[in-house]
Amino acid sequence: WAPDIIHVHGWMASLLPLYLREFYKEEPLFKESKIVTSLYNSGFEGELNSDLAVKVKFDLSENDKISTIETPTHTNILKSAIENSDAIIHGSEIISEELSSFIEEKGMPVLEYESENLKESYLNFYADLLSAN
């Protein structure tokens, strides 16, 4: 069973898109999968362990893919998730201006925050994403 869409939620799962795109890029199971990342107005102050990039480098062959997380702030690890995703969903009404600008620069599909009609909005967004090959 190959997933059509892998939906990642929040900063805790933000390295998953990088690993799927780089470490598992030859894995037939994930080759055609679309990655969607949901962003929320929650996170942490400061930085994660400064060895994070070193640990990720150990797994990945292309070190240029980890430059964003060399300073592992909340914003930077989310930028890494965005860079390695096919689409973004605003899971909160407020997303930082820096992340909003970064997403806009990438020109990727975005589902803005929805407080109602979630099911219909998500299904339509997924359908559009899958049909945009």
Language-model region placement:
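Catalytic cores of nucleotide-sugar-dependent glycosyltransferases that transfer UDP/GDP/TDP-activated
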Residues: 1-133
